[in-house]
């Protein structure tokens, strides 16, 4: 069978485009919150970055585990075991509920850790307020992630898109009202941004449940018979999902520590990084939608035993991702100063922030296509169950980067641009390693795939 098929390309685009819109909507939600906060001052922007990343660090292990439901559901769907798809959701809900005591302990510890990171005292209090607000809604985030992964796994990505887009229309006006205290509501500042996010997440869960409990869906996927522990599915969930969870946690830990070390340069440097990562997010997060589309189709074809179609999915994913990121990188390069000025703040430091962020945007345009390769190759490998290799490789590269950052920032006290380019080189290196694994093909050996499908 030919390596590239227009039919497969269209199928991938059909599945992925709603997920691109969905994840793009999340990027818009975060982007708008930070734009609102930029109207206050640059400290609020830096604090939202620090508090938001710290929250994701705390839930990253459980998010990584729960969202592997996507690949599991896709594999069962490809094998024709529709009744097992809904059982994956139940196991995911159980995992989410069991995670709550751990999240409470981790959240308390992380909240106290802000006092010892060397940040400005004003920034610390804002980071803690935003972090604690988001952590109160962490259970909602896990349940929402499970339901979104399920609908992506069965190929109904339009449900995910509709839900997330509608959630934006709750989040953005609510955050504006609560941040600035409009129409008689209290002026909550950064806490208002957090409450807007939590409320929108709870609203999204309600929408997902409307689709999940609809009569036709209940009948096709035997939802009424899915409530209960299924030891075989749960074991497979944990066996394949735990490496993804460890990878997610460790990589988030290294990124979080890198971010916190970088912010020790000062408020100007922290705000410059926050601005650059806001634009990075608008390019990277929609690409996660394509990553999910690739993972879903690879999982489906692994379940169906059709590896020839899997090859076409990989080729199609690379064409779409490199075309998208290449175009966006060119625009970011040409208009980088104008993009930075979107986040102009009224304080006197913005000139310094703009100068540093302009140079950092060059690094962003350099690594955007590496991100595309990482996401497509990683999605294919995860969909085929090669999660242990990804865990060891990705974790090792990220921790090597962090060790290098420790020497650059703490020991040698080199400038922020040296630290930034170390980060860029790490991403480019990881892209080469992922591509080598994918195209060498050990992950597709029949005996390996047979083990992946075992319960």
Where do the model's predicted regions map?
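Short alpha-helical transmembrane segments in multi-pass integral membrane proteins
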Residues: 1-19, 73-139, 185-242, 298-366, ...
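Short runs within selected transmembrane alpha-helices of multi-pass transporters and secretion channels
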Residues: 66, 70, 134-152, 160-168, ...
């Amino acid at each position: 069978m030919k390596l590239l098929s227009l039919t497969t390309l269209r199928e991938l685009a059909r599945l992925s485009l709603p997920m691109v819109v969905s994840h793009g909507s999340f990027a818009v939600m975060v982007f708008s919150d930070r734009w609102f906060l930029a109207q206050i001052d640059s400290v609020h922007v830096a604090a939202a970055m620090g508090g938001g990343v710290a929250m994701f660090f705390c839930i990253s292990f459980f998010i990584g585990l729960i969202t592997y439901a996507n690949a599991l559901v896709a594999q069962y769907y490809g094998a024709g075991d529709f009744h097992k798809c809904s059982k994956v959701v139940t196991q995911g809900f159980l995992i989410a509920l069991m995670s709550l005591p751990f999240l409470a302990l981790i959240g308390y510890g992380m909240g106290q850790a802000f006092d010892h990171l060397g940040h400005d005292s004003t920034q610390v209090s804002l980071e803690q307020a935003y972090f604690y607000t988001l952590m109160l809604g962490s259970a909602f985030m896990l349940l929402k992630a499970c339901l979104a992964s399920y609908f992506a796994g069965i190929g109904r990505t339009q449900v995910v898109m509709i839900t997330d887009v509608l959630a934006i229309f709750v989040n953005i006006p609510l955050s504006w009202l609560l941040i600035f205290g409009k129409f008689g509501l209290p002026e909550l500042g950064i806490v208002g941004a957090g409450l807007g996010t939590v409320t929108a997440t709870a609203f999204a869960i309600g929408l997902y449940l409307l689709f999940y409990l609809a009569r036709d869906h209940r009948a096709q996927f035997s939802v009424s018979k899915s409530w209960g522990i299924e030891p075989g599915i749960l074991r497979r969930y944990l066996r394949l999902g735990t490496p993804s969870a460890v990878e997610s946690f460790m990589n988030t830990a290294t990124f979080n520590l890198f971010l916190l070390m970088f912010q020790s340069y000062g408020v100007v440097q922290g705000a410059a990084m926050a601005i650059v990562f806001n634009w990075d997010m608008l390019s990277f997060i929609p690409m996660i939608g394509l990553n999910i589309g690739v993972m879903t189709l690879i999982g489906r074809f692994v379940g169906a035993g059709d590896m020839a179609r899997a090859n076409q999915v990989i080729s199609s994913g690379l064409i779409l991702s490199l075309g998208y990121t290449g175009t966006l990188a060119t625009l970011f390069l040409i208009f980088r100063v104008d993009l930075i000025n979107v986040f102009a703040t009224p304080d006197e430091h913005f000139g310094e922030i703009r100068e540093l962020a302009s140079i950092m945007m060059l690094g962003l345009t350099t690594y955007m296509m590496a991100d595309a390769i990482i996401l497509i190759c990683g999605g294919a490998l995860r969909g085929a169950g090669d999660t242990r290799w990804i865990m060891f490789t990705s974790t090792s590269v990220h921790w090597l980067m962090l060790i290098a950052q420790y020497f650059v920032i703490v020991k040698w006290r080199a400038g922020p641009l040296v630290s930034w380019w170390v980060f860029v080189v790490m991403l480019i290196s990881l892209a080469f390693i992922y591509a080598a694994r994918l195209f060498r093909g050990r992950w597709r050996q029949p005996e390996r795939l047979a083990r992946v499908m075992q319960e």
